[in-house]
Amino acid sequence: MNTTPDTPTPRALRELTPLEARILGVLVEKQHTVPDTYPLSLNALTAGCNQKTARAPVMNVSEDEVTTALDGLKHLSLVMEGSSSRVPRFEHNMNRVLGIPSQAIALLTILLLRGPQTAAELRLNSARLHGFADISSVEAFLDELAARAQPLVVRLPRAPGARENRWMHLMCGEVNMADFASADAGGGADSVPPSEFEALKAEQKRLADEVTRLNALVQRMASELGIDVDTPGNAS
């Protein structure tokens, strides 16, 4: 699945920090989803880094931290700062520096923002960046990214009970495959991935908070009406 990027000569890069990787992902994402505000101001870029949705892990970074990370990315030529506005604005230069086409950039961006994904998840989550015809085309680009002299992605061992392998980016360094293999070997067919487990815990807490709120509302209304009501929280 070879298409010609802006430049055919990729550069060897150092490992990125998690924040540097997040910044690159945000810049590519916002280039496609909010083109009217791209290149991004420091404030918009920081907000994108701290976004609660479509991010794993969720971050809470300051503008000073983002500025420091931007300096590192500018040194690598991965980010450029515009000079046509009084407010500094930043844009990515990933296509030229990495020497990969826009389709591959779209997949890499989702991995930078959301963590490990299956090919099917990547096709779904990258729809606003590029419309892949099918999963096989996604896998073809992933295979090319993994086969580079300096691989940008890796296929992870299949989790117990999973139907597909997940993929992970390597922009922040190599992955210890033994960690994934040992975790997989220790799990059973009903094992729940950590991300799904955390989501279930968050949902459980949300439901518990909602029950508490409703109980309080029932008690208040009963008190106003002079009615005695036993709620689960008050049952003996």
Curated annotation (Swiss-Prot):
It holds the Pfam family DUF480. SUPFAM superfamilies: Winged helix' DNA-binding domain. PANTHER family: UPF0502 PROTEIN YCEH. Belongs to the UPF0502 family. This is UPF0502 protein BceJ2315_62050. It comes from Burkholderia cenocepacia (strain ATCC BAA-245 / DSM 16553 / LMG 16656 / NCTC 13227 / J2315 / CF5610) (Burkholderia cepacia (strain J2315)). The lineage of its organism: Bacteria, Pseudomonadati, Pseudomonadota, Betaproteobacteria, Burkholderiales.
